[in-house]
Amino acid sequence: MNGSVGIVETKKVTFPEITLECGEKIAPVTVAYETYGELNERGDNAILILHALTGDAHVAGKHRPEDKVAGWWDPMVGPGRPFDTNKYFIVCSNVLGGCYGTTGPSSINPATGRPWGMSFPIITIRDMVNLQYKLVRHLGITKILAAVGGSMGGMQALEWAYMYPEMLKSVVAIATSARLSPFGIAFNAVGREAIMTDPEWRGGNYYGFEGPKRGLALARMIGIITYKSDISWQYRFGRTHTYETDQELFSHTSRFEIENYLYYQGDKLVKRFDANTYLYLLKAMDLHDISRGRGRYREILKELKTPLLAIGIDTDFLYPTYQQKEIVEALKEAKKEAYYWELSSPHGHDAFLIEFSKMAPILSNFLEYVAGRRATINF
C-alpha cells in the first residue's frame, strides 16, 4: 500500500487546565501527539485517529531509523494509503489518563511533587474528547473530515459526533459500541481485580517500587483472550504442547503453546504500560454510554448529525456486530446518513489492527466520498 511517512516525532503541548465531568480540574494538562501530512489553508482536511486501550499517539512511521516496529496503524497512513498524507492532515494524540506523554496517573502532580497515582481524578471518554478538542483548536483545525477509531477509539469518535458536531464531517467507528456492554464491564472488573490484589500495587502508590507486574500481566492475559476468536486460537496454536518427555507432560508446570503466548503478551505489556493508567482507562470505558445523562439511548443515537460508517467484525467476541448495527439502524430510522460494513476475519476484535488490505479500500472509499471527491459510496 504505497509509501511510509518515514521518520516522525511525538510532540507535546500544555494547556492551563481542563475541567472534568466529575467536577475536578487538572492544571496544567499536557497532551502528547503526532501529525502526518500538511494542514491546508482552510484548515479543513484534518483526520483525527483515536487509539484503543493500550495504544498511543504513534500511529505511523518510525521514531528512529533503527526501530524494528513502526506505528500501530502504519500500513494505513502515508502517501497513497487510505489515510493519504498527500491529501489529509492526520492527527493522533495519547488520551487523557494515558502513560505515553499525556497527563495521567503516572505524571507528577504539581501540588505534591509526586506521581498522581490513585489521587488522579476519575476521567471519562467525554473528558478525553474535550482535551482533544483543545488540541484540535491549538493546531488551527477548523473542520475535521473524519474522527476515526477502533474499540476505545471508536467510543471517542462517537462522543465527538455528539459533543462537537459543528467540527466534524464524519465518523468511522470500528469494532466498538455506543455504550459498553455488561459483558465488557465484567471482563474489565476481573482485569482490575488482578491489578489491585497484587501486593505490589500498594494502593496505587508503587512508583519507585517494583509495581504490580504480575497483576498487570494477568489483566493483559485476560484482555488478550477477548481480543481474539476461537478460530484464531485453533489456527495459530491448536493443542500444540511444549513438553518433550512424559514426565514433563504430567506436570503442573508444563504448558500448551497458547499458554506461553498469553504469558508472553502479559509480560510484554508490563514493560511498556502503567498499571494505574490501565485502571483509569478501564473505568472510563465502563462509564461510556452515549446516552448517560442525556436521554433515552436510542433517541440519543438518532441525534447524531454527521455521516457515519460503522465497521463490525464477524468474529468479534468483545464487541459483537449487533453493537455496531444498532447505531446504524437508529440513524437510518431517523433518516440520517449511516453505513455499515462487516469485516470477515478469523482474528476477532483485533482484526482492525491486522486486516489492513481488507479495510483499506473501504476506508479510502468513505473518506473520498466525505471529502467530496466521489459522488457515491461503493461497498
Swiss-Prot record:
Residue ranges annotated for the AB hydrolase-1 domain, each copy included: 45-355
Keyword Membrane attached: no
Catalytic activity reported: L-homoserine + acetyl-CoA = O-acetyl-L-homoserine + CoA
GO BP of this protein: homoserine metabolic process; methionine biosynthetic process
Residues holding substrate: 220, 350
This protein's record includes keyword Cytoplasm: yes
Primary location recorded for the protein, binned into one broad class: cytoplasm
GO cellular component terms attached to this protein's record: cytoplasm
PANTHER family: HOMOSERINE O-ACETYLTRANSFERASE
Stored NCBIfam families: homoserO_Ac_trn, PRK00175.1
Task of the protein: Transfers an acetyl group from acetyl-CoA to L-homoserine, forming acetyl-L-homoserine.
Record family assignment: Belongs to the AB hydrolase superfamily. MetX family.
Subunit text: Homodimer.
Name the UniProt record assigns to this protein: Homoserine O-acetyltransferase
